[in-house]
């Protein structure tokens, strides 16, 4: 994806620091204080232009959401949604999510969303995929005991790789669809990419997974 440079983006982000948290590491262990309640916290890694996380926050006021996106020129579009209509249960982070433990403590997060992540198709780039084992370990470090990962993509190869990676890590699948839009799954909120790809006839794949809490018998 080629990103369009937006020279105003950084100034906009600095101006609205109540929405885009510039120092997330300082809130490590204290995100509930920042939100002002003890509601569950869900994060989206690679939030892009923010439609998904914004609509989720709007639909679920009793859940706090944090959208994490490293590209300034992209996250500013998510910020514009909050400027137009503020949601008290949504914050944004303009940082790389390579190590979430810098931002969150163990058990601070209830769910991780991964939507249409970069597939990094070349084998030598496998470690960059957000479902590679080091990332799975990273999510495990910040999730509650029964926390979940919800993963969605139109890329069959990435989906198959992710299922294998999660299984090898010892995760348990609680939901799996090989054609989400033609399933009986309810409550799906589409991302910008999802709408684009599905309109072209692409299948949408989805899996929900938990970390195994007991040893295999």
UniProtKB/Swiss-Prot annotation:
Gene3D superfamilies: Vaccinia Virus protein VP39. GO terms for molecular function: tRNA (guanine(46)-N7)-methyltransferase activity. SUPFAM superfamilies: S-adenosyl-L-methionine-dependent methyltransferases. GO terms for cellular component: tRNA methyltransferase complex. Pathway: tRNA modification; N(7)-methylguanine-tRNA biosynthesis. S-adenosyl-L-methionine binds at residues 44, 69, 96, 118. Its EC number is 2.1.1.33. Keywords: Methyltransferase, S-adenosyl-L-methionine, Transferase, tRNA processing. The active site is at residue 118. Substrate binds at residues 122, 154, 191-194. InterPro entries: SAM-dependent_MTases_sf, tRNA_(Gua-N-7)_MeTrfase_Trmb, tRNA_methyltr_TrmB_bact. It catalyses: guanosine(46) in tRNA + S-adenosyl-L-methionine = N(7)-methylguanosine(46) in tRNA + S-adenosyl-L-homocysteine. NCBIfam families: PRK00121.2-2, tRNA (guanosine(46)-N7)-methyltransferase TrmB. Catalyzes the formation of N(7)-methylguanine at position 46 (m7G46) in tRNA. Belongs to the class I-like SAM-binding methyltransferase superfamily. TrmB family. PANTHER family: 3-DEOXY-D-MANNO-OCTULOSONIC-ACID TRANSFERASE/TRNA GUANINE-N 7 - -METHYLTRANSFERASE, PENTACOTRIPEPTIDE-REPEAT REGION OF PRORP DOMAIN-CONTAINING PROTEIN. HAMAP family: tRNA_methyltr_TrmB. This is tRNA (guanine-N(7)-)-methyltransferase.
